[in-house]
Amino acid sequence: MFLYLCFIFQRTCSEEMEEENATLLTEFVLTGFLHQPDCKIPLFLAFLVIYLITIMGNLGLIVLIWKDPHLHIPMYLFLGSLAFVDASLSSTVTPKMLINFLAKSKMISLSECMVQFFSLVTTVTTECFLLATMAYDRYVAICKALLYPVIMTNELCIQLLVLSFIGGLLHALIHEAFSFRLTFCNSNIIQHFYCDIIPLLKISCTDSSINFLMVFIFAGSVQVFTIGTILISYTIILFTILEKKSIKGIRKAVSTCGAHLLSVSLYYGPLTFKYLGSASPQADDQDMMESLFYTVIVPLLNPMIYSLRNKQVIASFTKMFKSNV
């Protein structure tokens, strides 16, 4: 089906270009933060440090969960998967941005652009599904504590993880397939620091209304479904906690769920505003800042958010550190 769509869209593009006798652009310029040329070196160093800390933090968390048998439970399986996705998301965007800070040419080929876009949509969507899965896991742990081992079996956890990654891949394939109908013949300037769908649609000389509709339908559906799952899960958790009227239980629930709620807020806030304001042609700078937050800053913060207030993770880290000294 995907190959058929690609064939149809490529054929349509070639026919349109033959009719218009236009020149097809196959390279683009990522403007990024070019409007601040005096800050190139400081920005390069800042983002390099952020990227290194992000990779070390997320990979370190994965290794910690993998090595400690006490962390081989669903909650940490999902957390390790989130750390992997965060490291992948940051690696999709940051290296190219760092190269562009130092390179004279800011060019990116169409094929490179499509690969980056595909990787970005896959990781961003997968993270949405993972955050929803983690909310469901917390719901079962708090509201159905006695049945938790029965419900959250290894088989179910693996299925939820696989579905999250498949959902991310399918979402990316849909937008990638529809992007083959686009042609670029007027401008090759992408007002962004990576290849994203909205900036590409803005410079396309093909009618991109179908693509905008696909973004609205599919990206909107993913956000509504995952945010809805998270809100329902935590609403039930809240009522369950209030019914128990136990200070100790409330503290434990807040400690367990607080990190996840903070991560969800930081991630979905800019992501939602980005697509709500994407139709505005004046929103380029704001769009870049929102994108920077959920592609670079959130992957940096997540390991800290989930680790600093988690006694099990801290104890595991201390134990592993002492054993290696």
UniProtKB/Swiss-Prot annotation:
Compartment(s) where it occurs, according to its Swiss-Prot or TrEMBL record: Cell membrane
Disulphide connectivity of cysteines: C113-C205
InterPro entries, A to Z: GPCR_Rhodpsn, GPCR_Rhodpsn_7TM, Olfact_rcpt
Segments traversing the membrane: 42-62, 71-91, 116-136, 156-176, 213-233, 254-274, 288-308
Stretches of the chain found on the membrane's Cytoplasmic side: 63-70, 137-155, 234-253, 309-325
Membrane recorded as keyword: yes
Entry's Gene Ontology cellular component terms: plasma membrane
Molecular-function annotations in GO: G protein-coupled receptor activity; odorant binding; olfactory receptor activity
Coiled-coil annotated spans: none
Location, primary (coarse class): membrane
Glycosylated residues in this chain: N21
Keyword check for Transmembrane helix: yes
Keywords: Cell membrane, Disulfide bond, G-protein coupled receptor, Glycoprotein, Membrane, Olfaction, Receptor, Sensory transduction, Transducer, Transmembrane, Transmembrane helix
Top-level division of the source organism's lineage: Eukaryota
Residue ranges annotated as Extracellular topological domain: 1-41, 92-115, 177-212, 275-287
Topological relation to the membrane, as annotated: Multi-pass membrane protein
Pfam families: 7tm_4
Role description: Odorant receptor.
Family the UniProt entry places it in: Belongs to the G-protein coupled receptor 1 family.
Protein name per its UniProtKB record: Olfactory receptor 5H6
Gene that encodes it: OR5H6
